[in-house]
């Protein structure tokens, strides 16, 4: 039960929830804490002033905000709690849990009213302190949020089991111990709060005050309040809306927004969701059991490592003492290596024990909380939180997936001392990675017919010789740096196929592979030469035959037919080839089509009448098609995207099934050169803030782009934009997006800069400088946005120009900041 306690505490005050309410994001807040973190919104910024009156804000329209940009021009505008500035006349303070609390903008309520019952200022806004989602309250104020009766029941049972002292429910800071309870108000008071909020005069003089212990008993014996509809407070929930995933009353079905929705019986859905949560808990329980057994195994490994270390050190000392004085100088070095290996193993195992212990404690707490929730007999209250709990249970179960319950370190010391060398070889005395006399694996064979390159990625495949009798524990793939430098390991594992991404375009790499087991490593395979893409399109390599030479070449041939160009970079990729070669096509340059005649040799093209924005001339020239097409194209990558991302249009169009921001990357990474791509806004509802930019391959996929240090982005709404990296917001710029808008991203790795464009106009200054490394195009969005990579070709941004000379098209100059 102790692990469950953190599930029962408010993220604002840090105490047990008191009168918890459920926010649209499924998180909970004390009603008093919710009032403390309200922020009043000016009339000009409210949604009612931007839309027709009476439209209202639904429970799930919390993305329809102006991102809290209300107090300062330097404000970032994103609803990240504690990250926006307050007005100079509005001091703010932090709660014990570190959440920034704003005082109410209205005068304090009368003393005879509790804070939970006081009127909410008009156009008040509340931000969830856990997920940082913001919502402007409607006329109902906090009464529009449903009460979490199930959570209240769980907290009551938990406190009774702990015999905890009852706390005052009206203390603004750390709650004091309650001294009385009012049976009519159903509120616990300390002495100062009782005198201030419940004076013994007027109507309150007739209220009966009892000791807290007696009040707890009477509260437990009294029937729990039935959850009522938030839209119709006098009606109880009677049905369950399948589309909105919430209980509703009969008036909602007759005249409310659920009248055309599919509904089901409340009791049936209650049983169904209880069954789903129970099934999810079964899987999580199995994971928790495995984790406990795994922790026992890890603790046993600590003892085994200690014993093996002592045994190994004794053997080492015995061998070194038998040698002459020259060996004694070497002995100290060898002992140091053993101790280092010993400490390394212990550190790895202890770190894994600590990690698994924390994860197991969190899992156990969630299980206990879910079991207590299942015991509740309130269908309506249960259904309000069941979906969120089921998702959390599945997510926690997935975190115990493959590899989590595998030891990261072995208990054996795979070292042995060879004491046979003569004294003249004493300076070469060292450990050998051998403890048995079994042979090393045979040299792997590269399967050339399965090796290929695609854009800036290379796929290699290998196998063991057919007649080999020695098993390999794994393989080590090595690649040089593309410039003839030293080899480095890019893969270590049991698989016999590996795809290496993020290579330089138009570069040559050398690859080799070797096998290993407990005895040692095999010799290297033959060296394979890889040539990455130097042309647009997707090309497959031809099968290759094995040769007797030590070096083999993996070709990247120009195909006889070229696929339509989907996505190209850099700026010189404004050529748009629709049909396959040979034949006729059209040249799309600044929306002006010009006929091209394509030579069958595919070496050049003629563009009569093309105006390349030189001073006044109109050119008819031969352009080197090899250089013109030395670009990359890409689509969105379903493999690395968040599971909520929805793909269409050959992975060129994406949207999301969640109200939360989710990240999707492009398939191709860039590490040098100048690259530009555009995205169009196909759908834009409720003024969300999608983000566009670049990211590392390991960027967080479940939050807005730029929230971590792995992404560089611009997020934009219908009025303005900001640049964001590592959750730092800069350069607020006026001008937003609507449906049909175009977002351009210019990644200049030669100058190490990142620039953004909106509707062909540069948005703000150069967004980021000193960017270097491997970057992937990236977008974050939610279900209110749909974007597409610009197809069928690219356009040059306003202010960009091209230089044209016979036989070549050069890369453009970047627009002036």
Curated annotation (Swiss-Prot):
In the record, which positions carry Phosphothreonine?
A: 41
Gene Ontology molecular-function annotations = ubiquitin protein ligase activity; zinc ion binding
Q: Where is the composition biased (Basic and acidic residues)?
A: 537-547
| Catalytic activity entry | S-ubiquitinyl-[E2 ubiquitin-conjugating enzyme]-L-cysteine + [acceptor protein]-L-lysine = [E2 ubiquitin-conjugating enzyme]-L-cysteine + N(6)-ubiquitinyl-[acceptor protein]-L-lysine
In this chain the B30.2/SPRY domain maps to: 613-794
Pathway named in the protein's UniProt entry: Protein modification; protein ubiquitination
Self-association or partners: how does it assemble?
Answer: Interacts with SNAP25.
Please identify the protein, giving its name as recorded.
E3 ubiquitin-protein ligase TRIM9
**Where is the organism placed in the taxonomic lineage, from the top?**
Eukaryota, Metazoa, Chordata, Craniata, Vertebrata
Report the gene name.
Answer: Trim9
């Amino acid at each position: 039960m102790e692990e469950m306690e953190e599930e029962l505490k408010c993220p604002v005050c840090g105490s047990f929830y008191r009168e918890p309410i459920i926010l649209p994001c499924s998180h909970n807040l004390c009603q008093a804490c919710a009032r403390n973190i309200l922020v009043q919104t000016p009339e000009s910024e409210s949604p009612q002033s931007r839309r027709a009156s009476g439209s209202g804000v639904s429970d799930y329209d919390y993305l329809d905000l102006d991102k809290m940009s209300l107090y300062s021009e330097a404000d970032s505008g994103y609803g990240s709690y504690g990250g926006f500035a307050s007005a100079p006349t509005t001091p703010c303070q932090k709660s014990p849990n570190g959440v920034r609390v704003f005082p109410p903008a209205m005068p304090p309520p009368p003393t005879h009213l509790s804070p939970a019952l006081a009127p909410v200022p008009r156009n008040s806004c509340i931000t969830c302190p856990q997920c940082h989602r913001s919502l402007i309250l409607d006329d109902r104020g906090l009464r529009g949020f449903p009460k979490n009766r199930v959570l209240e029941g769980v907290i009551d049972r938990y406190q009774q089991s702990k015999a905890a002292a009852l706390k005052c429910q009206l203390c603004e800071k750390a709650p004091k111990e309650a001294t009385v309870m009012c049976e009519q108000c159903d509120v616990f008071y300390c002495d100062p709060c009782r005198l201030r909020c419940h004076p013994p005069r007027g109507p309150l003089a007739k209220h009966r005050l009892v000791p807290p212990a007696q009040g707890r008993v009477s509260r437990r014996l009294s029937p729990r309040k039935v959850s009522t509809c938030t839209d119709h407070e006098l009606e109880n929930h009677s049905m369950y809306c399948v589309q909105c995933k919430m209980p509703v009353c009969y008036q909602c079905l007759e005249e409310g927004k659920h009248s055309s929705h599919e509904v089901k019986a409340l009791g049936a859905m209650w049983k169904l969701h209880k069954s789903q949560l129970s099934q999810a808990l079964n899987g999580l329980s199995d994971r928790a059991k495995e984790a406990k057994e795994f922790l026992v195994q890890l603790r046993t490994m600590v003892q085994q490592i200690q014993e093996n270390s002592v045994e190994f050190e004794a053997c080492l000392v015995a061998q070194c003492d038998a040698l002459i004085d020259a060996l004694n100088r070497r002995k100290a070095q060898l002992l140091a290596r053993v101790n280092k290996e010993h400490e390394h193993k212990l550190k790895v195992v202890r770190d894994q024990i600590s990690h698994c212990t924390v994860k197991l404690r969190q899992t156990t707490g969630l299980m206990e909380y879910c079991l207590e929730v299942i015991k509740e007999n309130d269908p309506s209250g249960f259904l309000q939180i069941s979906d969120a709990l089921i998702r959390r249970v599945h997510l926690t179960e997935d975190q115990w997936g493959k590899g989590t319950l595998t030891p990261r370190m072995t208990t054996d010391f795979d070292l042995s001392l060879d004491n046979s060398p003569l004294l003249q070889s004493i300076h070469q005395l060292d450990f050998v990675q051998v403890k048995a006399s079994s042979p090393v694996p045979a040299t792997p064979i590269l399967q050339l017919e399965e090796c290929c390159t695609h854009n800036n990625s290379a796929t290699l495949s290998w196998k063991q010789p057919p007649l080999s009798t020695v098993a390999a524990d794994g393989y080590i793939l090595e690649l040089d740096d593309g410039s003839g430098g030293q080899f480095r390991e890019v893969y270590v594992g049991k698989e016999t196929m590996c795809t290496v991404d993020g290579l330089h375009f138009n570069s040559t790499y050398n690859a080799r592979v070797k096998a290993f087991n407990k005895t040692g490593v095999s010799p290297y395979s033959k060296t394979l030469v890889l040539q990455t893409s130097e042309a647009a399109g997707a090309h497959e390599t031809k099968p290759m035959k094995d040769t007797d030479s030590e070096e083999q070449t993996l070709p990247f041939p120009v195909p006889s037919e070229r696929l339509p160009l989907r996505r190209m970079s850099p700026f010189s990729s404004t050529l748009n080839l629709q049909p396959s070669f040979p034949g006729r096509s059209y040249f799309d340059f600044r929306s002006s089509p010009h006929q091209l005649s394509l030579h069958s040799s595919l070496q050049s093209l003629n563009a009569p009448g093309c105006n390349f924005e030189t001073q006044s001339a109109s050119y008819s020239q031969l352009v080197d098609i090899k250089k013109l097409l030395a670009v990359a194209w890409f689509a969105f990558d379903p493999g690395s995207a968040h599971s909520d991302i929805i793909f269409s249009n050959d992975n060129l169009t994406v949207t999301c099934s969640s109200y939360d921001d989710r990240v999707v990357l492009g398939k191709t990474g860039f590490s040098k050169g100048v690259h530009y791509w555009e995205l169009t806004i196909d759908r834009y509802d409720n003024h969300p803030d999608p983000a566009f930019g670049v990211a590392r391959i390991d960027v967080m996929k479940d939050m807005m782009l730029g929230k971590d240090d792995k992404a560089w982005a611009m997020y934009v709404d219908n009025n303005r934009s900001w640049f964001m990296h590592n959750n730092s917001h800069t350069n607020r710029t006026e001008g937003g997006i609507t449906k049909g808008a175009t977002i351009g991203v210019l990644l200049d790795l030669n100058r190490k800069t990142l620039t953004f464009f909106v509707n062909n106009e540069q948005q703000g200054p150069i967004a980021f400088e000193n960017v270097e490394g491997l970057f992937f195009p990236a977008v974050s969005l939610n279900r209110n946005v749909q974007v597409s990579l610009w197809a069928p070709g690219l356009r040059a941004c306003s202010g960009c120009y091209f230089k044209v000379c016979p036989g070549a098209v050069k890369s453009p100059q970047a627009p002036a900041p």
